[in-house]
């Protein structure tokens, strides 16, 4: 539940299933990328590029003129390419694969995975002020990197919703589950191979 200062009109073309997941994913991506000053000419690494936040993050970076390298499972690579990023697979040697894709270096990273992926970001990005984690908050202060501040607003959401209405952003819905199948939704999420958003609906 949010206050009226967090609300904006839903674009007519946006389905309610998308609207239910759009605000959190889009605002998190926008806030995170602006924290690391992602912009024109940058090479941006996004860990978890096929998830909801990563999906929006790739598209925003492309709109701003950045090149994106996106980490994802191999089954998600075609999807990540369709968003405008160059995908790479995790696993042994993935830091080397990123370096091959970005021979001039990586300027910034938004991490949606944590753990070894975050460790790799610290090795790949020279400036820790341009590394942000969405998940490993406990290590952020220790490592001297960024996390997303509480900066959601109606104004930010309205701007992002307008980009959706213009066709500049989209958020695919992988699956919907009724509330009484919330456990199934969680299992689907934990199974991986996510492309976009899983939404719980309430009749």
Label the predicted regions.
Residues 1-203:
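Terminal helix/beta-alpha structural elements that buttress the NAD(P)+-binding lobe
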């Amino acid at each position: 539940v949010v206050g009226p200062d967090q609300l904006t009109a839903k674009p007519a073309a946006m389905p309610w299933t998308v609207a239910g997941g759009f605000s959190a994913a889009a605002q998190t991506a926008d806030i995170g990328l602006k924290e690391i000053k992602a912009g024109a000419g940058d090479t941006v690494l996004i860990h978890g590029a096929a998830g909801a936040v990563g999906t929006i993050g790739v598209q925003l970076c492309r709109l701003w003129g950045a090149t994106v390298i996106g980490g994802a499972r191999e089954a998600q690579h075609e999807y990540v390419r369709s968003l405008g990023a160059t995908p790479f697979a995790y696993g042994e040697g993935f830091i080397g694969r990123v370096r091959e894709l970005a021979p001039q270096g990586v300027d910034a990273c938004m991490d949606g995975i944590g753990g070894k992926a975050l460790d790799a970001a610290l090795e790949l990005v020279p400036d820790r002020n341009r590394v942000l984690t969405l998940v490993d908050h406990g290590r952020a202060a220790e490592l001297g990197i960024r996390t997303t501040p509480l900066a959601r607003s109606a104004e930010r959401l309205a701007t992002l919703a307008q980009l959706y209405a213009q066709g500049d952003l989209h958020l695919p819905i992988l699956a919907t589950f009724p509330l009484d199948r919330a456990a199934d939704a969680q299992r689907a999420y934990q199974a991986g191979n996510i492309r976009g958003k899983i939404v719980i609906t309430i009749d």
